[in-house]
Amino acid sequence: MSRDVYVCSKPLQYFNVRNIDYESTAREKVLVIIGFFRDAHSFFEKVKQLDDSWTEVLYFDSMFQFDRYLFTHPAETLFAEIDVSFIYGIFHKLSRFKRMYVFEEGFGAYRNRMDDSKGLKRKINQWTGAGDHVGYAKFLTGQYLYKPDLYRQLYPDYAKELRSFRRPFMERLREELPMFLNFSTGHEEFLTLRGKSIGIYITNHEINEKILATLEAERERFDLIYVKLHPHIQETIALKDHPVKIIQSNIMVEFLFILLLDNGNKLTIFHESSTSIIWFQNLVENRNLGKPFEEYDGVAAYIQSETL
């Protein structure tokens, strides 16, 4: 039976695949959730119960399990976050999918990203057509982006399809908020905060002690200070002696921003070139304490200029 398969491993990816407008002749529309985030199985159960957009909703603990599924259940069109994968290249050669689109997850979609694999893996990538440049795999049909015009400006010779999402990011965020509150856990306390001065630190893969020191020095400015941990962080002992609360939620932080701003809270966001802040630059105090990052700054400036 013909099917289109949408695979996502984070709530933001699920948010984005719901915003894809794709006309298809496939009889099935299958959503695959990979359990790489907090309370992922609970999220999957809620999606399965409440989101009737899909013919089938599946859950896998690992990409290996998904690869086994795709091998035995070929797709007409595959939607994924990244194309630099020799597994996808092999599967395309074996006709496990006919077309493939990657979709934006954040500002990284606009970066000149290279896969620096060496040796045998690099040779396999080249043989399978995955290549070494994100968005340029030989088997890739195209990309879904929020700012395709920016992408064309950055990469004028790009030859594959560039498609827009159904709705602009901020508009879609408003539309999806009620449903995501039903899907998510641990956000309840944010519904009651009103008129507060709140600091939020969005971590990268590691907790930055210098940012914690900044929060410590500025603690009198805030009624509350929160830390939103990167999903890969398991150890939180570095936060033990600091005046912060860990956000114990799997909800997209962008939805928390909306909730808090709508209730009249003043937000100061500390981060290191985070995608999450890029759409809110004119609505919060933006404290980017990361190292200079020209590609990020260019994308952020483009989006900020469009929202002024």
Q: Could you describe each region identified by the protein language model?
A:
Residues 1-2, 22-27, 51-52, 67-76, ...:
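Flexible, charged surface loops at secondary-structure boundaries
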Residues 61-68, 232-281:
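Donor nucleotide-activated moiety binding/catalytic core segment of transferases
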Residues 116, 120-197:
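A nucleotide-sugar donor-handling region in carbohydrate enzymes
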Residues 185, 194-233:
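Conserved catalytic-core segment of nucleotide-activated headgroup transferases in glycan assembly
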Residues 276-308:
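Catalytic binding pocket for nucleotide-activated donors in carbohydrate/polymer assembly enzymes
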